[in-house]
Swiss-Prot record:
It catalyses: L-seryl-[protein] + ATP = O-phospho-L-seryl-[protein] + ADP + H(+); L-threonyl-[protein] + ATP = O-phospho-L-threonyl-[protein] + ADP + H(+); [DNA-directed RNA polymerase] + ATP = phospho-[DNA-directed RNA polymerase] + ADP + H(+). This is Cyclin-dependent kinase 9-A. The active site is at residue 153. It comes from Xenopus laevis. It is an enzyme of class 2 (transferase).
Amino acid sequence: MAKNYDSVEFPYCDEVSKYERLAKIGQGTFGEVFKAKHRQTGKKVALKKVLMENEKEGFPITALREIKILQLLKHENVVNLIEICRTKVSPTANQYNRCKGTIFLVFDFCEHDLAGLLSNAHVKFTLSEIKKVMQMLLNGLYYIHRNKILHRDMKAANVLITRDGVLKLADFGLARAFSLAKNSQPNKYTNRVVTLWYRPPELLLGERDYGPPIDLWGAGCIMAEMWTRSPIMQGNTEQHQLTLISQLCGSITPEVWPNVDKYELYQKLELPKGQKRKVKDRLKAYVKDPHALDLIDKLLVLDPTQRLDSDDALNNDFFWSDPMPSDLKNMLSTHNQSMFEYLAPPRRRGGHMPQQPANQARNPAATNQSEFERVF
């Protein structure tokens, strides 16, 4: 355990009491996140509590991995880890238990997350502002992928935005380094990553030798969500999620995805047959810009080897045609309250309500406006 601590480049852990907790802004399997301020300087920060699943096993390897990755990644569009703090420990603590107790990761504070902003009907994004959001998101992905890091949990709630309109990729709790597989030795990463509604088809089919395309699928889901205001494919199970993907992106077959039949799950699951690709048709009621539709379509490609990467996505005509990307600062300045998914009122948390199976879903035209906004 001491060896694990020594590998983290923070020479000691300050006490978390140097920060005053102001509000809880997040909750999940990872633990809790609090808005706080430095008692002396007044600087606002976010405190992420490290969940000690089994303290006898020492410092959680997932938290250690997150810390190491965040120490490596320094970019305007990646959340900044300031330091690591702990609760007060015994005066008899030694080098082997100097960070015993509750551990907190301390980050620069961001006023909003994208899920919180999209859950608020009063927040209106112009096309130029959506372009800026996606440009910053893809810049962040380009940077982490160049540094051989996969995020593995791309979703709107993990996209933070500061009051000045700067986007930060956040929550690297599932992130990991990756390498190009050698023919004789394919990678064997876990495929139990990425929140279900944003999980790409290759992971749902059991792929363990994957790379950056898994994050780009999530980017495509998030981009569509900028218009639909809620996740576009809200499956209840992995098979249901694959069914929704097939209904939107077309049937999963070897014709559109060579060698997909190599997956054992592909043979076992009864996936929809004869489905045509409908990404543009289904989204055009929301997305009026043809370049935007084109980019979403190229990100939501079934075959990961044909999916657009972040570099090509940033060169898409969407970002280089009028209206050009514009800052979010002015729009955000009209909203004084922080907006996070965790704090969204229940009636606005449509993203948390699983979509009905296709054979039970009602005609959108027959739903009231609030229901129509919730389910794509």
